[in-house]
Swiss-Prot record:
Name of the molecule in the record: NADH-ubiquinone oxidoreductase chain 1
Organism: Chlamydomonas reinhardtii (Chlamydomonas smithii)
Gene Ontology CC annotations of this record: mitochondrial inner membrane
Lineage: superkingdom: Eukaryota
Lineage: Eukaryota, Viridiplantae, Chlorophyta, core chlorophytes, Chlorophyceae
Residue stretches spanning the membrane: 2-22, 71-91, 98-118, 132-152, 167-187, 213-233, 235-255, 272-292
Listed PROSITE patterns: COMPLEX1_ND1_1 (PS00667), COMPLEX1_ND1_2 (PS00668)
HAMAP family: NDH1_NuoH
């Protein structure tokens, strides 16, 4: 029974990740006026599965003088946490769903940090430090935005649909900045463009020493976290959970990647600490005073 429950949770997420990767490659190809995946299966539907098989049959390499246990555990930690985060969304009667999901998602930083430290590589460690700093910086604004919404629409932090059609005009305008900040923080939290570190594609990413299933687990965790954050945005800002709304938000992720240039490290740190955090804290203080 327990195994069946775990499979019911994991299998749909894995299938959605596979379709998200296919959709991203197809949309990016359309934006760049080139052909996307179209050989494997009908319209390239089997391409994600062949990519996963290719990664699965590659030889796992353990760097010399690395911490073997931590090196193997870090991708599994990231993968498990990306799946467990869906529990807070699936349990609709929980009183503190927002806090539960934020607590689980905040633990993802440990998988990234452990990967950079256990690799015993200066490039992986430097990439890990920058990725951790990015995630922690925008996680504060993300949590403050969620708590502000929780104080505004309910007496606790339970997930309630923020239906703009049922609200007066003034609160709608008050929620719009929080919605925009939340969407930008999602991009930073999931390490997506334009908040992706440019050197991560060269030799300074936290997962530079990983191959085979370890790299695949990090890849799956990233896209699963995108789906979780899109679901939270759909619930809080778009009137409720909907697969269509999550797909639209994912398309916005891909659109952002295909159109915007990357920020430098100092630029997105300045944006997080000097712009987003003061704004979200101001909204939190305002909504708390109204609730009191």
């Amino acid at each position: 029974m327990i195994v069946a429950s775990i499979l019911i949770l994991i299998v749909p997420v894995l299938l959605s990740v596979a379709m998200f990767t296919l959709a991203e490659r197809t949309v990016m190809a359309s934006m760049q006026r080139r052909f996307g995946p179209q050989v494997s299966g009908i319209s390239g539907l089997l391409q994600p599965f062949w990519d996963g098989l290719k990664l699965g049959v590659k030889e796992p390499v353990l760097p010399d003088s690395s911490s073997a246990g931590a090196f193997a555990a870090s991708p599994m930690i990231s993968f498990v946490l990306s799946q467990v985060a869906w529990v807070g969304i699936c349990i609709s009667d929980a009183s503190f769903q927002g806090l539960v999901i934020m607590a689980i998602s905040s633990l993802a930083v440990y998988g990234v940090m452990l990967a950079g430290w256990a690799s015993n590589s200066k490039y992986a460690f430097l990439g890990c430090l920058r990725s951790v700093a990015l995630m922690v910086s925008y996680e504060l604004s993300l949590g403050a935005a969620l708590l502000s919404i929780g104080l505004f629409v309910t007496d606790g932090t339970g997930m309630k649909c923020l239906n703009f059609a049922e609200m007066p005009t003034t609160p709608q305008y008050a929620m719009l900045p929080l919605c925009l900040i939340f969407l930008v923080c999602i991009l930073a939290e999931t390490k997506r463009d334009p908040f992706d570190l440019p050197e991560a594609e060269l030799v300074a990413g936290y997962n530079v020493e990983y191959s085979s299933l370890g790299f695949a687990l990090f890849f799956i965790a990233e896209y699963a976290n995108m789906a979780v954050m899109s679901a939270i945005a759909s619930i809080y800002f778009l009137g409720g959970f909907s697969a269509l709304k999550i797909t639209a938000l994912f398309f916005a992720f891909v659109w952002t990647r295909g159109t915007l240039p990357r920020y430098r490290y100092d630029q997105f740190m300045r944006l997080g600490w000097k712009a987003f955090l003061p704004l979200t804290l101001a909204f939190f203080a305002l909504h708390a005073s109204v609730a009191i």
